[in-house]
Amino acid sequence: IQKEGLVENAAELGKYMLEQLYLLKEKHSTIGDVRGRGLLVGVELVLNQEEKTPANDLAEDVLYRCLNKGLSFKLSMGNVMTLTPPLIIKKAQIELSLEIIDQSLSEAEKAL
């Protein structure tokens, strides 16, 4: 872990991923919250920003759209996308993952 610099990689890329997800939150009203530490990140999907009504059906739709595009993650509590990439992930892979999430959210929001 030390030899490969995995802790530093997780801190650096985790910060980058959170910054990019905060930008996606500004674009998508269905993102109610983004939280995380290192490469463990949660993205809460909601129907209503003010009341934070959980968007379980939307989250499931986004999950399957992402899976069809090659991105796998876990849903927690029905509406929280739990992103836990490997510690060896590269920035380009995070960028691709974020593109997939952005596209899938846009598609699922239109289908609401």
Task: Pin down the residues of each PLM region.
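Conserved N-terminal phosphate-binding loop of PLP-dependent enzymes in the Aspartate aminotransferase
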Residues: 1-112
